Amino acid sequence: MSDQHDERRRFHRIAFDADSEILQGERRWEVLLHDVSLHGILVGQPQDWNGDPQRPFEARLYLGLDVLIRMEISLAWARDGLLGFECQHIDLDSISHLRRLVELNLGDEELLERELALLVSAHDD
C-alpha cells in the first residue's frame, strides 16, 4: 500500500488469527482473517465469493470457545484476493472484546483512547 494510504489510516490494524466467517442473508463464507481494527476487518476472498456489495454483511470472529466478536459490516473494497470491510455497528460485548484485543496489542492505553474517540466521532458524522 502507498505511504499516502498509510498516512490516512486512523486506526491501527492488529494481525490476528481467528476462525472467522462472513454472512449475508442465507449465504455464509469461512474466511481467513488477516487483521482487525476498531474500524473493520481485512479478510482473504473466498473462492466461492458472490456477496452483494450493496447489502450489509455480518462478521463473526471466534476468539475462543466462549468469546465471539460480531460486527455489522459493509464491503469497502475488493482487490488482489482481499476484501476490506468497514464496521457499521458492533454490540457492547463485541466492542469490549475488541477493545481488549486492541489494547493488548497496542500496549498503549492513551493510543487506544484516541482511536476510540475517532471511532465515535466517525459514527457521529
Swiss-Prot record:
Record motif DXSXXG motif, residues: 35-40
Result of altering G40A: Abolishes c-di-GMP binding
Binding site for 3',3'-c-di-GMP: D6, E7, R8, R9, R10, F11, H12, R13, W77
Pfam family, one: PilZ
Residues with site note (Important for c-di-GMP binding): G40
Entry's Gene Ontology molecular function annotations: cyclic-di-GMP binding
Sequence motif RXXXR motif, residues: 9-13
Start and end residues of each PilZ domain: 7-103
Oligomeric and partner information: Monomer in both c-di-GMP-bound and free forms.
Name under which the protein is recorded: Cyclic diguanosine monophosphate-binding protein PA4608
Organism of provenance: Pseudomonas aeruginosa (strain ATCC 15692 / DSM 22644 / CIP 104116 / JCM 14847 / LMG 12228 / 1C / PRS 101 / PAO1)
